[in-house]
Swiss-Prot record:
Gene Ontology molecular function terms on file: pyridoxal 5'-phosphate synthase (glutamine hydrolysing) activity
Active-site residues, record numbering mapped to chain: 82
HAMAP family: PdxS
Name of the protein in its database record: Pyridoxal 5'-phosphate synthase subunit PdxS
Organism encoding this protein: Actinobacillus pleuropneumoniae serotype 5b (strain L20)
Binding-site residues, D-ribose 5-phosphate: 25, 154, 215, 236-237
Pathway: Cofactor biosynthesis; pyridoxal 5'-phosphate biosynthesis
Binding site for D-glyceraldehyde 3-phosphate: 166
Length: 295
């Protein structure tokens, strides 16, 4: 039974159910209820949103299990939680708690700088970040059921998420248009499993959903990522660090769903109050860029 529950087909199917939606970071039950009422398809339970993690510095770990439990009991939508890259026990604890997804996340301080989790060993589905197709396929090869761009979390600056999504999509088009005898060389170049390149060639797309994340702060940002081909969006600090979280949450959900209705997005963007304060990426030292974590 465990093997059936944890099969790739089941786990990827669960992720497909979130397609077209918004997943919001929350730090308590009240925020989780706001997210659910706004139309979020899932919430990510954590102790601090990425902008606060960035500001605090030091080591960022898995959220206190009491916070995760509080969020799980507050909402009926799926609940995700973050584990550190390579931290087997954090992931096993979250799996034992019954979370719906685990995010092996670069937002937290990596526990292992050499090895990511072997996600196929778990019954719970995983979401992982990527900056390019090589990273995406390595994570899928380890068992990830869902991808997201890394972007640059906690900045309110969407430029890195745009860069990562455009790069993945450009590399996908290249693979899809290759002849079969070129795929092995491309697999070597990407550092990715050959079998996954064959899947992409056959399917004409990634075998899992790919959401946008990292720096999304406004309804227009969310719509932009959908316009560029994202399957949905994660919003971290952008909602609950804004002036009016309830309005921002509802507006971002609507903009994600109706991303080509520009008149609607204009109306949604009126009277929202101030968005979260943004950071210029070029002003961040390389060691402060969360997207650099993992490989």
């Amino acid at each position: 039974m465990t093997k059936i529950l944890g099969s790739d087909l089941i786990k990827r199917g669960m992720a497909q159910m979130q397609k077209g939606g918004v997943i919001m970071d929350v730090v308590n039950a009240e925020q989780a209820r706001i997210a659910e009422a706004a139309g979020a398809v899932a919430v990510m339970a954590l102790e601090r949103v990425p902008s606060d993690i960035r500001a605090a510095g030091g080591v960022a770990r898995m959220a206190n299990t009491a916070i995760v439990r509080e969020v799980m009991e507050a909402v009926s939508i799926p609940v995700m939680a973050k584990a550190r890259i390579g931290h087997i026990v954090e992931a096993r604890v979250l799996e034992a708690m019954g979370v719906d997804y685990i995010d092996e996340s670069e937002v937290l301080t990596p526990a292992d700088e050499e090895f990511h989790l072997l996600k196929s060993d778990y019954t719970v589905p995983f979401v992982c970040g990527c900056r390019d197709l090589g990273e995406a396929l390595r994570r899928i090869g380890e068992g990830a059921s869902m991808l997201r761009t890394k972007g640059e979390p906690g900045t309110g600056n969407v430029v890195e998420a745009v860069r990562h999504l455009r790069k993945v999509n450009a590399q996908l088009r290249k693979v899809i248009n290759m002849s079969h005898d070129e795929l092995m060389t491309e697999a070597k170049h990407l550092g990715a499993p050959f079998e996954l390149l064959l899947q992409i060639k056959t399917l004409g797309k990634l075998p899992v959903v790919n959401f946008a994340a990292g720096g999304i702060a406004t309804p227009a940002d969310a719509a932009l990522m959908m316009e560029l081909g994202a399957d949905g969006v994660f919003v971290g600090s952008g909602i609950f660090k804004s002036e009016n979280p309830e309005k921002f949450a509802k507006a971002i959900v609507q903009a994600t769903t109706h991303y080509q209705d520009y008149d609607l997005i204009a109306r949604l963007s009126a009277d929202l109050g101030e968005p979260m304060r943004g950071l210029e990426i070029s002003e961040l030292a390389v060691q402060d860029r969360m997207q650099e974590r993992g490989w």
